[in-house]
Regions:
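Thiamine diphosphate
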Residues: 1-167, 172, 182, ...
Length: 317
């Protein structure tokens, strides 16, 4: 298969900003709402080019969600933007009541997700947001892996009717997905074919999964790597097809072990074809302050942790 290479590291939030810039030019119904974080969400170009479609709500996230829900009634497609912690935990009641329950066409765009927010620490990091959002009926949940995929996802969700949670991050990470790769909601992407183990990864852990596959190949272990950008609806077919071939799976995510991708995959397997599974995720704890690199190592969210999980799960086949 094609070998994926880092074409130049970028932050995924800049991919979101680039997607918003393109949407601003293409779709006059797209509007942006920001909770006092224009630079952090990379809304600068959209605000400059379309000031009449940009709304600075301030540090009033609950109001932002309510306003966004109202704008959909007039045919607008609102994209809200703030940190992932404030996009979910702080406004969960408003999302449930005003957006999800009434199936409003709001795009909840959440930057600085996971541990890799870094030095701001546990009060600003969030590791439970995927679980919160995937439990809401009708909510589509997307977690992108690099700049190119985040840009493509941002553009794609504008054409999807219904509430969407789009999750991306702050740090600079490898950019390896092709810029012309189609983004299809709910369809996994097979990155590397293998026969011994399936690695199902999402977000920043996708690149780490590819690095792990290289290391495993040197040890004589053939790893299949699947990029799951859409947590809900999950591509059950792709997972079952791969695990049916390899006989075991490792899930990898920058999220709590409870409520995330790993649990969704476990449910699919339990209902269809139970197989050994190992989880690479945060073991039910809050984060802390540190550089992204320090935190990913401490909480075992890197390629070495994936390799170790693969070695464990293969022994259980």
């Amino acid at each position: 298969m094609k070998k994926y290479e880092n074409t130049g590291s970028k932050d995924t939030r800049s991919g979101f900003g680039a997607g918003m810039t393109e949407l601003g030019q293409k779709n006059e119904n797209v509007v942006a709402l920001c909770a006092d974080l224009i630079g952090s969400l990379k809304f600068d170009d959209f605000k400059k080019n379309h000031p009449e479609r940009f709304f600075q709500i301030g540090i009033a996230e609950a109001n932002m969600i309510g306003i966004a829900a109202g704008l959909t009634i007039g045919g607008k497609i609102p994209f809200t933007g703030t940190f992932a912690n404030f996009s979910t935990g702080r406004v969960y009641d408003q999302i449930r009541q005003s957006v999800a329950y009434s199936d409003k066409n709001v795009k909840i765009c959440a930057s600085h997700a996971g541990l890799t927010l870094g030095e701001d620490g546990a009060t600003h990091q969030i590791l439970e947001d995927i679980g919160l959002m995937k439990m809401l009926p009708g909510m589509t949940v997307i977690n992108t892996c690099d700049y190119n995929q985040t840009k493509a996802a941002t553009i794609a969700i504008a054409d999807h009717h219904g509430p969407v949670y789009l999750r991306f991050g702050r740090p600079v990470v490898p950019n390896f997905m092709p810029s012309d790769e189609p983004f299809v909601i709910g369809k996994a992407i097979l990155l590397n074919e293998g026969t011994d183990v399936t690695i199902v990864a999402t977000g920043h852990l996708v690149w780490e999964a590819l690095l792990a596959a290289e290391a495993l190949e040197a040890r004589g272990i053939s790893a299949e790597v699947i990029n799951i950008h859409t947590i809900k609806p999950l591509d059950d077919e792709a997972i079952l097809k791969s695990v049916g071939k390899t006989g075991c799976v490792v899930t990898a995510e920058e999220h709590n072990i409870l409520g995330g991708l790993g649990e969704s995959v476990a449910r699919v397997l339990a209902l269809n074809t139970p197989k050994p599974q190992e989880f690479v995720a945060v073991n039910d704890s809050f984060g802390e302050s540190g550089t992204p690199e320090q935190l990913m190592e401490k909480y075992k969210l890197n390629n070495q942790a994936i390799v170790e999980a693969v070695e464990r799960v293969i022994k259980r086949k």
